[in-house]
Curated annotation (Swiss-Prot):
It comes from Leishmania tarentolae. One of its GO terms (molecular function) is oxidoreductase activity. It is found in: Mitochondrion inner membrane. Residues 1-17 form a transit peptide. It comes from the Eukaryota. InterPro entries: TPR-like_helical_dom_sf. The keyword Membrane applies. Keywords: Membrane, Mitochondrion, Mitochondrion inner membrane, NAD, Oxidoreductase, RNA-binding, Transit peptide. This is Protein P18, mitochondrial. One of its GO terms (cellular component) is mitochondrial inner membrane. Residues 160-187 are annotated as: Disordered. Its main location: mitochondrion.
Length: 187
């Protein structure tokens, strides 16, 4: 009897989850997952500051609607386009760090692999902020992952590097202030 009842329970659960025909998804606990991210993407696009966009992602998770690649890309775009993290800018805020934090959440928490568009937003931020060293790293990653890098962004990054070299800011000022190991006299 126990075997029969356990088979019936398993079959009933399998039928419940399979009856969706692939349209419905269920989480680990058997709750239905909402896959309609379109209204959430619109909310992200309406945000003025990128901290608000992060709150939209939190709300999505609370409502059992995990963000997909399109939602993450819209959030990366919002981080790039927003004037600041909050209405009153936060000291030492970094859009690049915010983007990398979001990419980490994408890959490791939600198992969503960033695509070329995702990394293009990061590269655009490197170019816009003048961080040409980070731009080199992102370009190398894009070349390895996608076999191409947006040529216009590479040229703009090279222009940033050339400008920094011409201004004498090719290397961070802290390196220029450090004393060489060979210049130290030990007595």
């Amino acid at each position: 009897m126990r075997r029969l009842s356990s088979q019936l329970m398993c079959t009933a659960a399998a039928v419940r989850f399979a009856s969706a025909g692939g349209a419905k998804k269920y989480d680990l606990f058997g709750y239905e997952v909402d896959t309609n991210t379109a209204p959430w993407i619109e909310k992200v696009k309406k945000c003025r500051y990128y901290d608000e966009a992060g709150e939209v992602l939190v709300s999505m998770n609370v409502k059992n609607c995990p963000p997909d690649l399109e939602t993450y890309n819209a959030t990366l775009q919002k981080i790039f386009e927003a004037p600041s993290k909050q209405e009153k800018p936060v000291e030492n805020e970094s859009k690049f760090c915010a983007m990398m934090d979001l990419m980490e959440e994408m890959q490791h928490r939600n198992k969503v692999k960033p695509n070329e568009e995702s990394w293009t937003w990061v590269m655009k931020e490197c170019v816009q902020s003048g961080q040409f060293r980070l731009g080199y790293c992102v370009a190398k990653l894009m070349e390895a992952e996608f076999k191409r890098v947006p040529e216009d962004l590479v040229k703009q990054n090279e222009a940033n590097a050339a400008k920094a070299k011409a201004d004498g800011k090719e290397h961070p000022s802290t390196l220029a202030q450090q004393q060489s190991l060979f210049d130290i006299k030990i007595q």
